[in-house]
A protein has these predicted regions:
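Acidic helix N-cap motif at the loop->helix transition within catalytic regions
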Residues: 55, 82-90, 138
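Long helical/loop segments within the catalytic core of UDP-sugar-dependent glycosyltransferases
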Residues: 101-102, 109-113, 117, 123-124, ...
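N-terminal membrane-anchoring/stem segments of glycan-assembly enzymes
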Residues: 1-37, 351, 377-380, 384-388
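Cell-envelope/extracellular polymer assembly enzymes that use nucleotide-activated donors
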Residues: 39-42, 72, 208, 223
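Short, acidic, metal-binding catalytic loop of nucleotide-sugar glycosyltransferases
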Residues: 59-70
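Catalytic donor-sugar/metal-binding loop of nucleotide-sugar-dependent glycosyltransferases
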Residues: 225-243
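Membrane-embedded multi-pass helical conduit in multi-pass membrane proteins
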Residues: 33-35, 294-390
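A conserved acidic beta->alpha catalytic loop
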Residues: 68, 77-86, 105-107
Length: 396
């Protein structure tokens, strides 16, 4: 029964995305044009030991095609141990719209530095930008275009991997590209689940009405999105407002990142379990439950697998009927093959939507992603559940 449940959930999610793509088109997804009168925007950049990196971020911000009299950049230093503050000060002397603030609440995490910056922000819109992320020239203009609709309370960007080189970075480049389209499709259902740290823009009233980023969360950009969904705040998503972000280049660094994401996600599911309800529309009856089921499904499969290893039993369910493979295909084989083909179709369609000169997504990379990434995800979840079981403290 377990393999049929896994197959059903996977098939449902894949078909859902394909149907959304069919509904809203594959050639182009229209995005609003920037307003004639641009709003004043505050960009908050939290930094900690980012010497040699934050300068590149500030250069990208300065190069943006956005009136500097409509812009303020607030860099919040979380008591860096290196020369990050001195590097930022060089920019504050040259550019009047850039200022440096020292965070007094150090040691709490990235969300604390963001909150400090937000308290000093004067903009009608507040953007949060990671210190290792580089927005394109037109990114901010494209994102502010969404706020011409008074019901829109936040907008997310098109996050891409910055200059991927080795295989680990290339795999993430494909993953990020697929996520871009997935998040856009979820916005049509009013079901965006995260406002990514690399670049997201909020109305200032979001923080006035709902409070600051949760300093107790290790995945604060997802927590704030859930909080917005809980209050029926609309989140839009752009597939052309590009921001490039540094991605882990080593497997252990990637592992630590994904453990934090997974454990933070589990806590957010638990915190907002009340939202598993018709009251919250597609987000409450489909997207949130499916995310939770996916995590629990991985846990059950892994638990069953390790149980068979310990007991020495033959686990036919986990192997998807491998023994019967030699005697003929069973139902599970057919369903598994269908899921694989639909997944391939989904990724190819997603590639078509966002493929451009910004980044090459060759079919070779896609094939490598399809082969290697499921194994990596399994490893990430094994490590996640092990840390949860032993109660290891998770820091940002």
């Amino acid at each position: 029964m377990l393999e049929f449940f896994v197959a059903f959930v996977t098939l449902f999610v894949t078909v859902l995305y394909l149907l959304l793509m069919y509904e809203y088109g594959t050639d182009s997804i229209d995005e609003p044009k920037p307003p004639n009168v641009l709003p004043f925007v505050s960009i908050v950049i939290p930094v900690y030991n980012e010497q040699g990196v934050v300068g590149t971020t500030l250069d990208a911000v300065i190069a943006m095609d956005y009136p500097k009299n409509k812009l303020e950049v607030i860099v919040v230093d979380d008591e860096s141990k290196d020369a990050t503050a001195k590097e930022v000060e060089q920019y504050t002397h040259k550019h009047h719209f850039i200022k440096l603030i020292k965070n007094k609440h150090v040691g709490i995490g990235n969300s604390s530095a963001k909150n400090t910056g937000i308290k000093h922000a004067k903009g009608d819109l507040i953007a949060t930008l990671d210190s290792d992320s580089y927005p394109s020239r037109d990114a901010l203009k494209k994102m502010t275009a969404y706020f011409q609709d008074p019901s829109v309370m936040a907008a997310t960007s098109e996050v891409r991997a910055y200059k991927p080189r080795n295989i680990i970075e290339q795999l993430q480049a494909v993953e990020y590209a697929v996520t871009i389209v997935s998040r856009k499709l979820l916005s049509f259902l009013d079901a965006v689940t995260v406002t990514p740290g690399p670049l997201s823009v909020y109305r200032a009233e979001v923080f006035k009405n709902l409070g600051d980023f949760d300093t107790g969360s290790i995945l604060e950009d997802q927590e704030i999105a859930y909080r917005m969904q809980a209050n029926n705040y609309k989140i839009e998503s752009s597939i052309s407002a590009t921001v490039y972000t540094q991605v882990p280049s080593k497997i252990m660094t990637l592992l630590r990142q994904r453990i934090r994401w997974n454990r933070g996600g589990i806590r957010n599911y638990i915190k907002y379990r009340r939202m598993f309800s018709l009251k919250y529309g597609d987000f409450g009856i489909a997207i949130l439950p499916l995310g939770f089921l996916g995590a629990m499904m991985v846990f059950v499969v892994l638990l069953s697998f390790f149980y068979t290893l310990i007991t020495g039993q033959y686990f036919e369910n986990y192997t998807y009927g491998l023994n019967s493979f030699f005697y003929g295909f069973g139902t599970v084989h057919v369903v598994s093959a269908l899921i694989f083909l639909l997944t391939v179709a989904w990724i190819i369609i997603a590639r078509k939507v966002i493929q451009n000169e910004k980044q090459d997504l060759s079919y070779v990379k896609i094939v490598a992603y399809l082969i290697a990434y499921p194994f990596l995800i399994t490893i990430f979840w094994i490590a996640t559940f092990l840390e949860e079981i032993i109660g290891k403290k998770q820091k940002w």
